[in-house]
Amino acid sequence: MNKDQTLSHTTGRVSFKELQQIIKMGLVQGNLIPAFAGAWLAIVMTNHSFLSSIPQILLMLVGSTLIMGGACALNNYYDQDIDRIMPSKQGRPTVNDRISDRNLLMLSFGMMLIGEACLFLLNIPSGVLGLIGIVGYVSYYSIWSKRHTTWNTVVGSFPGAVPPLIGWVAIDGSLSLAAVALFLVVFCWQPIHFYALAIKRSDEYALANIPMLPSVKGFKRTRVSMFIWLVLLLPLPFLLSNLGVTFVVIATLLNLGWLALGFTTFRKESNQTKWATQMFVYSLNYLVVFFALVVVVSLIKMI
């Protein structure tokens, strides 16, 4: 499809549902969970008042939402060529020409600029971490690694793990071991989560010539990599031992449960897609449960 044809079919206003697809609202919401947990933990561990910290939390969440949504919109702009090839992406407004390139870029950069303004209003570290997340996701992941190396998921995991750091520094202004621990949890979680998704869409990525690990190295190699990242998750709850024995035990059981799920089905010649789906669903629940546990346990300690 040439440019004239694309513009001629770009008609009407983008609906709210389509806007959510453009900025990948599901992905953004998932990242707001560790961002809030980072802020909450900073309040508890540095003895800040929750009520007096509410403005910072809200500004952090708004700023984080905007920079993540803007970066995702820019990713959708850059990925239009491969999205048109992949069957699962055919419903995207960028594929159906529901938004022009000009409006898409204006939306993307507008959101990122306003989001960065919000974060810099909080403090310089928040704004700098926001910039690191944007550059890492757009440049190093979307533009470079996604199309050139099977390490793309790991590269993308770094900017994807920045939200809890932003949450922490929004309150405290500097990083701590607890903040780094939250970063590492999200960093190690992402390859497992996205490899599971990539297994389910392996044929699509191969069709679009995207070097995702399952498409290039195969299913068995990808499962081994997922186990490595699962093992790396195991010691991380101990970095948050200040939250108490109860937290460490429950978080460790959460990790062991994920490992057991993967190992049990790994030993069987089960359907690859079914196995990947089980791991993917667990990953979604894991993220919510782990960070909810961080908030609840720290709340109990504060009371």
UniProtKB/Swiss-Prot annotation:
Compartments where located: Cell membrane
Source domain of life: Bacteria
Annotated pathway: Porphyrin-containing compound metabolism; heme O biosynthesis; heme O from protoheme: step 1/1
Signal sequence residues: none
UniProt xrefs under CDD domains: PT_UbiA_Cox10
Gene Ontology terms describing biological process: heme O biosynthetic process
Membrane topology: Multi-pass membrane protein
UniProt-listed Enzyme Commission number(s): 2.5.1.141
GO molecular function, one term: protoheme IX farnesyltransferase activity
InterPro entries to which the protein is assigned, alphabetical: Protohaem_IX_farnesylTrfase, UbiA_prenyltransferase, UbiA_sf
A single cellular component GO annotation: plasma membrane
Catalytic activity: heme b + (2E,6E)-farnesyl diphosphate + H2O = Fe(II)-heme o + diphosphate
Membrane-spanning parts: 25-45, 54-74, 118-138, 166-186, 230-250, 280-300
This protein's UniProt keywords: Cell membrane, Heme biosynthesis, Membrane, Transferase, Transmembrane, Transmembrane helix
Protein's job: Converts heme B (protoheme IX) to heme O by substitution of the vinyl group on carbon 2 of heme B porphyrin ring with a hydroxyethyl farnesyl side group.
Subunit organization: Interacts with CtaA.
Family, as annotated: Belongs to the UbiA prenyltransferase family. Protoheme IX farnesyltransferase subfamily.
Remaining remarks: Carbon 2 of the heme B porphyrin ring is defined according to the Fischer nomenclature.
The protein, known as: Protoheme IX farnesyltransferase
Species name: Staphylococcus epidermidis (strain ATCC 12228 / FDA PCI 1200)
